[in-house]
């Protein structure tokens, strides 16, 4: 009887494991011999692969994809926004391009406050006053001119064709458009005339044509940055600003320049991480968390064990305090990078973490002791020579500020919301930030975008990044930990359920199946608080050499791509 009972228990355990494995099963990563492109929109992925096939390098492909996404992924792909590009060249050189939007010269620290000093709801997220000076065109052209091999005309041509002739919408495309139907209905003369079909929401199988955007892209193709920052497009942008209550002028456009910076770098268990420096907080926070976790036996503790999750949550909590307190535009703020990236500092944080008691966010301050919108897009590319590019760029919210530079087809960002409108008041992503990120003329707002490249022995092994507002950092981090600490293959690491802690609010957001019920109970007994998932990220990742770190290649394939299934428009594609 005893043996029978044991056998039944064993069978029940086996069945539950089998059911879990069926639920959690991932497809194999996409393999290719000569190069790989992973983007959030399948047509853009194909554009990138065609550039690689024609002899272009990873930077050429990144530029072509950037322009193509402005057409086929208008919710976040853009030429009216900005972003970051991390580059690791095959010869070992690495660099970072900052084409983040800037505050207009007329911007002031209190521009979104009423007479009583309270934040005016929606002022920094909707309308022309919410728009920062766009940087995407400057960034793409800087990258192409310095690191690319193809002509501007060759790289913009696919985007022009897609805008001029249109492309057939699939379900994922219309799902994205439907998120802003009410906004388009309010702006029927401009965005509504483009992103609705004769006044009705688009349906799958219908064709989206963007003639004004095609004309703008032709001007950029012919004149480079002058096709956007001067002349017809600039005149229409400035006129739209003036008519709509915005403050961007021609002087703002004239002064915009892409910055080339040294990336943030750190080491984790034998791998070298190359990521985004300020005005991104991404690389700093990822490295700070990794430095903390490196002192714990994460592999031995096991994937999403109570102890491992507890340590990770607490590391996130402490690192986000520093993010929100210290970091800002390096032209205006002295960012204490050496201190935040110091492994001795990480050791002090570990000493402050109670192994079985959650920290209380409101009591954690920057330093020790005590501790001193999803709505973006990311793509990853590696070419046959090993050049790697990781790009995250954005309009901030879906479809940005919900306004256009009229007559240009260009949707404009609402990036001003990423500044601190008022110390202690959260932005759209719930981030509470400090004076270091205050609004000021010509300043670039702090960002969470984290385009990241991981190397070993000087060669690229991983390219990874995601959209998702403040969740970008933790989603990128967890994907890397899943491979480095837990031995997952690339697609498993991307698919795995995630959790997110950003200091404030107190609760940690968890996706379905991220924690088993008993693990969650243990963590709650230690004082951890949990809330449901936030909007999904979309990881776009590439591994070089094998489907998993330290694994064996499949056939002749050298490149392996993983597209996040959480959004249904993307594609990993190689050749």
Curated annotation (Swiss-Prot):
Maturation and modification: Cleaved by autocatalysis into a large and a small subunit.
One GO CC term on file: periplasmic space
Reactions catalysed: an N-terminal (5-L-glutamyl)-[peptide] + an alpha-amino acid = 5-L-glutamyl amino acid + an N-terminal L-alpha-aminoacyl-[peptide]; glutathione + H2O = L-cysteinylglycine + L-glutamate; an S-substituted glutathione + H2O = an S-substituted L-cysteinylglycine + L-glutamate
SUPFAM superfamilies: N-terminal nucleophile aminohydrolases (Ntn hydrolases)
UniProt KW keywords: Acyltransferase, Glutathione biosynthesis, Hydrolase, Periplasm, Protease, Signal, Transferase, Zymogen
Subcellular localization, as worded in the UniProt entry: Periplasm
UniProt-listed GO biological process terms: glutathione biosynthetic process; glutathione catabolic process; proteolysis
EC code(s) of this entry: 3.4.19.13, 2.3.2.2
Segment forming the signal sequence: 1-24
Coiled-coil features, chain-numbered ranges: none
Pathway(s) where this gene product acts: Sulfur metabolism; glutathione metabolism
Subunit field text: This enzyme consists of two polypeptide chains, which are synthesized in precursor form from a single polypeptide.
UniProt-listed NCBIfam families: g_glut_trans
UniProt name for this protein: Glutathione hydrolase proenzyme
Organism: Pseudomonas sp. (strain A14)
């Amino acid at each position: 009887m005893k043996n029978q009972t044991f056998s039944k228990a064993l069978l029940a355990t086996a069945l539950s494991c089998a059911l879990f494995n069926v639920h959690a099963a991932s497809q194999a990563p996409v393999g290719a011999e000569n190069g790989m492109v992973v983007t959030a929109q399948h047509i853009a992925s194909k554009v990138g692969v065609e550039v690689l096939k024609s002899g272009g390098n990873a930077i050429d492909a990144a530029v072509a994809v950037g322009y193509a996404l402005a057409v086929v992924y208008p919710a976040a792909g853009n030429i009216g926004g900005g972003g970051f590009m991390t580059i690791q060249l095959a010869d070992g050189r690495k660099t970072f391009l900052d084409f983040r939007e800037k505050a207009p010269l007329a911007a002031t620290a209190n521009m979104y406050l009423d007479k009583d000093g309270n934040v005016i709801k929606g002022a920094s997220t909707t309308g022309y006053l919410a728009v920062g000076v766009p940087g995407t065109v400057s960034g793409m052209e800087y990258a192409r001119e310095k690191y690319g091999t193809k002509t501007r005309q060759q790289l913009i041509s696919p985007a022009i064709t897609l805008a001029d002739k249109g492309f057939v919408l699939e379900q994922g495309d219309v799902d994205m458009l439907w998120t802003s139907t009410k906004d388009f209905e309010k702006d029927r003369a401009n965005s509504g005339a483009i992103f609705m079909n004769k006044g009705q929401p688009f349906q799958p199988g219908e064709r989206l044509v963007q003639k004004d955007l095609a004309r703008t892209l032709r001007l950029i193709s012919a004149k480079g940055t002058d096709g956007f920052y001067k002349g017809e497009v600039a005149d229409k942008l400035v006129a739209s600003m003036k008519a709509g209550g915005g403050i961007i002028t021609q002087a703002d456009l004239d002064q915009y320049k892409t910055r080339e910076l040294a990336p943030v770098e750190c080491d984790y268990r034998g791998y070298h991480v190359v990521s985004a420096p300020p005005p991104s907080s991404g690389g700093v926070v990822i490295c700070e968390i990794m430095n903390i976790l490196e002192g714990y036996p994460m592999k031995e503790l096991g994937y999403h064990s109570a102890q491992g999750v507890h340590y990770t949550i607490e590391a996130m909590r402490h690192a986000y305090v520093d993010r929100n307190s210290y970091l800002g535009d390096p032209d205006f703020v002295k960012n204490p990078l050496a201190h935040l990236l110091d492994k001795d500092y990480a050791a002090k944080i570990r000493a402050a973490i109670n192994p079985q008691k959650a920290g209380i966010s409101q009591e954690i301050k920057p330093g020790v002791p005590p501790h001193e919108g999803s709505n973006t897009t990311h793509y990853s590319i590696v070419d046959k020579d090993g050049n790697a590019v990781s790009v995250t760029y954005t309009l901030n919210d879906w479809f940005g500020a919900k306004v256009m530079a009229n007559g240009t087809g260009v949707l404009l960002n609402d990036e001003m919301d990423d500044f601190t409108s008022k110390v202690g008041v959260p932005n759209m992503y719930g981030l509470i930030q400090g004076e270091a990120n205050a609004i000021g003329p010509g300043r670039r707002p702090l960002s969470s975008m984290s385009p990241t490249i991981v190397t070993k022995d000087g060669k690229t092994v991983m390219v990874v990044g995601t959209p998702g507002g403040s969740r970008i950092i933790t989603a990128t981090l967890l994907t890397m930990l899943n491979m480095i600490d837990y031995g997952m293959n690339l697609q498993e690491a991307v698919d795995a359920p995630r959790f997110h802690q950003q200091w404030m609010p107190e609760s940690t957001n968890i996706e379905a199946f991220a924690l088993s019920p008993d693990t969650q109970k243990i963590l709650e007994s230690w004082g951890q608080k949990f809330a449901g998932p936030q909007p999904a990220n979309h990881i776009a990742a590439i591994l070089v050499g094998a489907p998993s770190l330290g694994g064996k290649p499949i056939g002749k394939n050298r490149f392996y791509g993983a597209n996040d299934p959480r959004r249904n428009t993307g594609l990993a594609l190689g050749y």
